[in-house]
């Protein structure tokens, strides 16, 4: 899913995601354009509170993925200010970006697992890249395998896994480093409803440990399953007032 759209029309801020209080994430008048095209995200201003649960909703092409890319520092904005953990990351030297990225877990829509590595080795990658001692890596991987229910698949290769199993591997890999923020792009888009519920339970348990969750989805039924979550609805590159979105939720994958 590639963020897109234009930025015509009125400008509304998402309720519950805007305020003067400093948060773990702050966007101020952020805009993004690719190349010489029109802006795909326009005048985004919001603050996310540490430990909260957020859904980013909107139609395909609304700009959800583009927003997530800026959150996990894969994309710099064209204009505006972004602060993560109290630091201006727009002007952050590239040499410091990896240190910030280690504080942010990412679950990609297409999983991005390494096909020739086992499930256990895929999950271990972030810790090994960070130079963690191997004994600690093994213990952490064992814990993650149990958490996502894949202990008996530790030596399997990703191509032999179902879509739901691959997604659980991706989640375990994203959280093994105990990130302060977890960003997930359509994490339930390739699984059935039963697996979607299981993944949501994993996210909720992680949020219960204090991790800030930002999940992009077009599955409206997910919104009603996490009553405490706040909603950031994007339409044509702008944040809109989500009031009433849950009163008459459309069907799954609306």
Feature roles, as predicted:
Residues 117-125:
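Short coil-to-helix segment of the ABC ATPase nucleotide-binding domain corresponding to the Q-loop/switch region
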Residues 176-180:
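A short, proline-enriched helix->beta-strand linker immediately N-terminal to the Walker B motif
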Residues 182-185:
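Catalytic Walker B motif of ABC-type/P-loop ATPase nucleotide-binding domains
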Residues 89-105, 206-208:
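ABC ATPase NBD coupling module
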Residues 157-161, 165:
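Conserved ABC ATPase signature
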Residues 80-88:
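Conserved ABC transporter NBD signature motif
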């Amino acid at each position: 899913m590639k963020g897109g759209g234009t930025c015509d029309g009125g400008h509304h801020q998402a309720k519950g995601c805007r305020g003067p209080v400093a948060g773990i994430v702050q966007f101020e008048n952020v805009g993004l354009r690719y190349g010489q095209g029109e802006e795909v995200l326009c005048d985004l201003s919001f603050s996310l509170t540490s430990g909260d649960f957020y859904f980013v909703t909107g139609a395909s092409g609304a700009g959800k993925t583009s927003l997530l890319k800026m959150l996990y520092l894969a994309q710099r904005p064209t204009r505006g200010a972004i602060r993560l953990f109290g630091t201006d990351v727009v002007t952050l030297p590239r040499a410091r970006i990896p240190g910030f990225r280690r504080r942010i877990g990412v679950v990609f829509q297409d999983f991005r697992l390494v096909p020739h590595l086992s499930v256990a080795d895929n999950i271990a990658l972030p810790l090994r890249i960070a130079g963690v001692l191997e004994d600690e890596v093994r213990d952490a991987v064992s814990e993650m395998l149990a958490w996502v229910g894949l202990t008996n698949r530790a030596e399997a290769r990703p191509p032999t896994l179902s879509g739901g199993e691959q997604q659980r591997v991706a989640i375990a890999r994203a959280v093994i480093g105990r990130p302060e923020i977890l960003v997930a792009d359509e994490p339930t888009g390739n699984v059935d409803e039963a697996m979607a519920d299981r993944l949501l339970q994993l996210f909720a348990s992680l949020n219960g440990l204090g991790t800030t969750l930002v999940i992009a989805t077009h599955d409206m039924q997910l919104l009603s399953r996490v009553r405490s979550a706040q909603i950031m609805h994007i339409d044509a590159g702008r944040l809109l007032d989500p009031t009433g979105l849950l009163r008459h939720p459309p069907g799954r994958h609306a």
